[in-house]
Amino acid sequence: MLDGASTAPSEAERCIIAMMLMQIALDTHDEVTDDGGDLRARQLVVLAGDLYSGLYYELLARSGETALIRSFAEAVRDINEQKVRLYEKKVERIESLFAAVGTIESALLVKLADRMAAPQWGQFAYSYLLMRRLLLEQEAFIRTGASVLFEQMAQIAFPRAKTLTKEQKRHLLRFCRRYIDGCREALFAAKLPVNGLLQLRVAELSGGFQAIAKKTVEEG
């Protein structure tokens, strides 16, 4: 994405590091729980998240990247808004649930793509990261029957069901797979100059021929 925007290597490195620091800050804050555990431990986690957030801000402020600071601040706002919606279970449609998940997963990259005048990469990141999350949740649901995402899907689709029937579970899986297929099609339709590693990762996630070939080679 940054290569396509003809970005100077030093600027590209700065943008990537800043985004990574901001993502680490968000992930760290997500580890804070309100389960009444060790207060000091929770405070330390909050401070760690604040540290990463401060490092991100200092890195961009020193180089005068005020526009990127503003863009990332908007991304964090969008992410937090969607997290609150999910936490408070204010989502009434599964389509809206998946849209919220897509925003949470990709908002930082989408804002970076917009900042670099490469919105097509933002769309690519949204589809890729949403597909990745859906696949992880689907796998967890199939293997263990436990998935935060599928739990919310069930509450939306079958609000009166205390325990899901096999058919209801299949219905949720079909719905999820339909969205996974949609993300996969969007990725392959993008026609962007992705590098070999990203191509391989997309193929692995989507269950494409490259992933099958790679697995066959590894198994001898």
Swiss-Prot record:
The molecular function terms of the Gene Ontology recorded here are:
heptaprenyl diphosphate synthase activity; transferase activity, transferring alkyl or aryl (other than methyl) groups
Could you tell me the EC number(s) of this protein? 2.5.1.30
> Which biological process terms from the Gene Ontology are attached to this UniProt entry?
isoprenoid biosynthetic process; menaquinone biosynthetic process
- Source organism's superkingdom? Bacteria
Q: Which UniProt keywords apply?
A: Isoprene biosynthesis, Transferase
Query: Amino-acid biosynthesis: present as a keyword of the record?
Result: no
Catalytically driven reaction(s): 4 isopentenyl diphosphate + (2E,6E)-farnesyl diphosphate = all-trans-heptaprenyl diphosphate + 4 diphosphate
Its biological purpose is as follows: Supplies heptaprenyl diphosphate, the precursor for the side chain of the isoprenoid quinone menaquinone-7 (MQ-7).
Subunit structure, per the record?
A: Heterodimer of component I and II.
Protein name according to UniProt: Heptaprenyl diphosphate synthase component 1
Q: Which organism is it from?
A: Geobacillus stearothermophilus
